[in-house]
């Protein structure tokens, strides 16, 4: 099967992120979920963002993400949830061998993180009215996908952010189940 590197969101490597990784493992994939916050988790996006600022901002997150994959094979799928998408896109742009990308609840236009590797397919998932994804990232995601048959953008009704994390109050079980179904079908094609 496929080796996936799953970067967590701004609340840290929560039990919900671990559960997501475990579901992908149960489907036969090898999943590495680096802890970029060294064991710290947060109850809100605001608390997590304050921590990110305290360690040097997103530059430090990107540095930690690159360091986390140093000993991994090059041929991996880069996946992320929200802030983790920034890490996934950055690492894939800096390191050869990306097989594919799975971007949950975020997307960053390539001019901000580096070009996505040619030939590596991508799935992008997020809620239509999520203040971060739907109102900021959805348009750049659709622009990125335009004219490409290897990029799929999936939207879900609602406004929750971090809805795929079963350990957070924002979790939407129905939408998260559909994300899992689509991601696992995608990974099975690689």
Question: Residue locations for each model-derived region?
Answer:
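Gly/Ala-rich beta-loop-alpha elbow adjacent to hydrolase catalytic centers
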Residues: 80-84, 88
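Acidic catalytic loop of the alpha/beta-hydrolase fold
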Residues: 129-134
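C-terminal catalytic histidine-bearing segment of alpha/beta-hydrolase fold enzymes
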Residues: 150-190
């Amino acid at each position: 099967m496929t080796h996936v590197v799953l970067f967590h969101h701004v609340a840290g490597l929560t039990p919900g992120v671990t559960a997501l990784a475990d579901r992908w493992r149960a489907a036969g994939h090898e999943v590495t979920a680096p802890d970029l916050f060294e064991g710290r988790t947060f109850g809100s996006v605001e608390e997590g963002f304050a921590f990110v600022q305290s360690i040097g901002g997103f530059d430090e997150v990107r540095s930690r993400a690159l360091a986390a994959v140093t000993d991994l094979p090059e041929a991996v799928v880069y996946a992320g949830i929200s802030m983790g998408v920034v890490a996934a896109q950055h690492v894939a742009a800096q390191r050869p061998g990306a097989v594919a990308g799975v971007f949950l609840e975020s997307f960053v236009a390539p001019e901000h993180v580096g070009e996505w590797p040619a030939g590596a397919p991508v799935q992008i998932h997020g809620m239509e009215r999520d203040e971060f994804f739907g109102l900021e990232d959805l348009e750049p995601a659709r622009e990125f996908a335009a004219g490409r048959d290897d990029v799929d953008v999936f939207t879900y009704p609602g406004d929750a952010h971090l809805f795929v994390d079963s350990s957070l109050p924002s979790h939407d079980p129905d939408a998260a189940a559909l994300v899992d179904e689509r991601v696992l079908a995608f990974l099975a094609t690689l």
